[in-house]
Amino acid sequence: SPFILKFNDAQKDLIEPALAGTKNVLSSVNATTSVKRVVLTSSVAAICGDTIECANTPNGKFDEHNWNTTSSAIHQPYYYSKTLAERAAWKITEDQDRWTLVVINPALVIGPTLSGKSTSATHDILRQLGDGKMKAGAPPFEFGVVDVRDVADAHIRAAYIKRAVGRHLIFNEVQSLLGLANLLKEKYGTAYPLPSKELPKWLLWLVGPIVDKTFSRKMISLNMGQKWVGDNSKSIEKLGINYSSLKASAEDMFQQMIDQGEFHKK
């Protein structure tokens, strides 16, 4: 599924590709009798749509039992696309009994890429931290974070561990944009224009949609300044994942972007 923040048509750019990709692959699986297990890359986006929902969960934290029921084609459309795609996968799975489905639901994925420069939303976030766009302050936004190499490890384990079943929320730590910036400052100091404070929510609500169309007032109200809490115990107990250091993950990604000339010292 495309992971992009800037798009022209949510239905055509996000939702249709996510659904078509899932259905096409699983159609091929149904036609290939040797396949016994499918590992699907879904997302935390299929578990929760807005951070504020965390307070309404039974245990006060997101886990594999939760489904995103609040996103739509006009509110958090990327989250909506991932939810529709995973639900479609489970429906196709239920209609047959030859192969099993195991789902990986990663939170925000960071770490170095294999392909060099990237246009993914994750890279946009790190890029804006390092190129000065957030110098005046970072939005007060919390999220789960995981190293891309841990996500790869989770897929391999999900494929070969027999007891693996169902969904798996994959993240190491909960962090904020300012928290990521502070981790990077431990190595890079003030060499790059990393933010040193958070912007007030009221200011983002007032001017955010004017400055950046990806920030709707509804999105700001339901996510900024809210606590994100998740439960990753299933991934540790059932898949045996030993999560990497978030600090090392952020540094590896940031350094790769520096080496590629994506931003420069002040």
What do the PLM-derived regions correspond to, one by one?
Residues 43-74, 114, 131:
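Active-site "gating" loop of Rossmann-like NAD(P)-dependent oxidoreductase/epimerase domains
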Residues 111, 138-141, 168-175, 237-239:
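Glycine-rich Rossmann NAD(P)(H)-binding loop
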Residues 7, 68-74, 115-116, 121-146, ...:
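A conserved pocket-lining segment of Rossmann-fold NAD(P)-dependent short-chain dehydrogenase/reductase
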Residues 95-99, 111-125, 158-168:
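Glycine/proline-rich active-site loop of Rossmann-fold NAD(P)-dependent oxidoreductases
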Residues 31, 70-102:
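Active-site Tyr-X1-5-Lys
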Residues 1-20:
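NAD(P)H-binding glycine-rich loop region in Rossmannoid oxidoreductase-like domains
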Residues 208-240:
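Conserved C-terminal active-site "lid" loop/helix of NAD(P)H-dependent oxidoreductases
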Residues 154-217, 246-266:
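Mid/C-terminal beta-alpha module of Rossmann-like enzyme folds, strongest
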